[in-house]
Design a protein with these regions (language model features):
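Acidic/histidine metal-binding catalytic segments
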Residues: 38-45, 66-69, 105-115
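Secretory-pathway/luminal and periplasmic proteins that interact with or process carbohydrate-rich
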Residues: 28, 55-62, 120-127
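Short pre-active-site segment immediately N-terminal to the catalytic Zn-binding motif
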Residues: 2-19, 81-88
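Extracytoplasmic and endomembrane cell-envelope/extracellular-matrix remodeling and assembly machinery
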Residues: 76-190
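Solvent-exposed coil/turn segments that connect beta secondary-structure elements
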Residues: 6-8, 25, 31-34, 120, ...
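Catalytic Zn2+-binding segment of zinc metalloproteases
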Residues: 15, 25-42, 60
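Membrane-active amphipathic alpha-helices enriched in small hydrophobic residues
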Residues: 45-60, 65, 69-79
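Signal peptide-directed extracytoplasmic domains
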Residues: 1-12, 124, 142, 147
Length: 190
């Protein structure tokens, strides 16, 4: 799991950072990457078989479109299967990640809060059609994680002074042009 400065500055509190890490740990714990690779290897033979069939059909048919249609529809079905599988894994990682988040003593609402930020950012950039997404719709993730947080009735930690100090220092280093600007930034954060 990699953590970069973008995540550290985007996560406004320690619980949001913990929510992201809990989600990623769930992927590892559930062997999602290995299972996805195994699924793709199994599907590879089906794909190659139908590709071969489409070539044979195109070669022995007066209508070349039939072979092309078979090849393209197989490819579309394989991509759809991979995307649906990916979305299921993401939902599973959200659920298990929230349990990890709560077990670690953090407020479960932090996961929904982070998804809200992602949703706001996506609206600025532009939304992709749902059928092209590798993750569930962010609005669905917000609704699900908000409901689960309410059901868990957690009042865990959102933040710590150490996290805020580290985050403030990082942002000052990243965005300040000189030491006076850094000092002003620190004073504003207090």
């Amino acid at each position: 799991i990699g953590i970069n400065t973008g995540l550290l500055t985007y996560a406004e509190n320690e619980a949001e950072l913990a929510a992201v890490l809990s989600h990623e740990i769930a992927h590892l714990d559930q062997h999602h990457y290995l299972r996805a690779q195994e699924s793709q290897q199994q599907d590879q033979w089906l794909y190659l078989g139908t590709l071969l069939a489409s070539i044979v059909l195109a070669a022995h048919s007066t209508d070349n479109d039939a072979g092309l249609a078979l090849g393209l529809s197989t490819q579309a079905a394989m991509i759809d299967k991979q995307l649906r599988y990916s979305r299921l894994q993401e939902s599973e990682a959200d659920h298990i990640g929230m349990q990890t988040l709560v077990s670690a003593g953090f407020n479960a609402q932090a996961m929904a809060d982070f998804f809200k930020k992602m949703d706001q950012q996506a609206r600025i950039v532009g939304l992709m059609p749902e059928f092209l997404l590798t993750h569930p719709l962010t609005q669905d993730r917000i609704a699900d994680s908000t409901l689960r947080a309410q059901q868990l009735h957690t009042k865990g930690e959102l933040n710590s002074l150490d996290y805020q100090l580290a985050r403030t220092r990082l942002m000052a280093i990243l965005y300040a042009k000189d030491h006076n600007q850094q000092l002003q930034h620190y004073q504003q954060q207090l």
